[in-house]
């Protein structure tokens, strides 16, 4: 077992983490999650956790549905429940075929292979997520949402709720 995996197992035991969430994405980038008991984690590291890949959009065909999730210990994070009473662990996973090979349909694996190919060609790849959101007024009716102002994408707004909120976000990110 790798050192990072052993460290995760120790952290889970010492911090009384009672649930492990295994995260991966479908081909559209939509986050998916499988939850396991901490007692299954050592086997997940060594063998992977089986799941039906045909249930995930674009991952595999029905007759090739058996897939494996293998957690990447380097992505381990603690997640606190909303009320702060419980701590879960989460890790992103590699999606593998039943014989333990990387699935060609795994977006994370595809990115890793593309970065490796670019590196072999002498390029450096820099990637990051783009976080977007909408600022809406508290809805009276969930079917009729209203923005806090009429500013559009990239509009320069010097006053108002959206400008104040963006300023608070920037300050929080700088801390």
What are these regions (language model features)?
Residues 1-175:
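Glycine-rich, acidic/polar active-site loops that bind/position phosphate-bearing ligands
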């Amino acid at each position: 077992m790798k050192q990072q995996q052993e460290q995760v197992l120790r952290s889970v035991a010492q911090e009384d983490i009672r649930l492990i969430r295994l995260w991966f994405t479908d081909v559209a980038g939509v986050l998916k999650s499988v939850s396991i008991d901490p007692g299954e984690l050592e086997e997940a590291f060594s063998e992977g956790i089986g799941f039906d890949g045909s249930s995930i959009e674009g991952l595999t065909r029905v007759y090739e549905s058996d897939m494996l999730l293998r957690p990447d210990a380097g992505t381990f994070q603690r997640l606190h429940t909303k009320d702060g009473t419980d701590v879960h662990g989460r890790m992103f996973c590699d999606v593998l075929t039943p014989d333990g090979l990387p699935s060609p349909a795994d977006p994370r694996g595809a990115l890793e292979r593309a970065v490796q190919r670019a590196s072999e060609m002498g390029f450096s790849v820099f990637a990051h997520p783009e976080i977007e959101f909408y600022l809406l007024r508290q809805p009276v009716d969930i079917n009729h949402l209203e923005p806090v102002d009429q500013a559009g994408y990239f509009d320069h707004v010097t006053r108002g709720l959206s400008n104040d909120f963006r300023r608070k976000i920037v300050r929080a990110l700088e801390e």
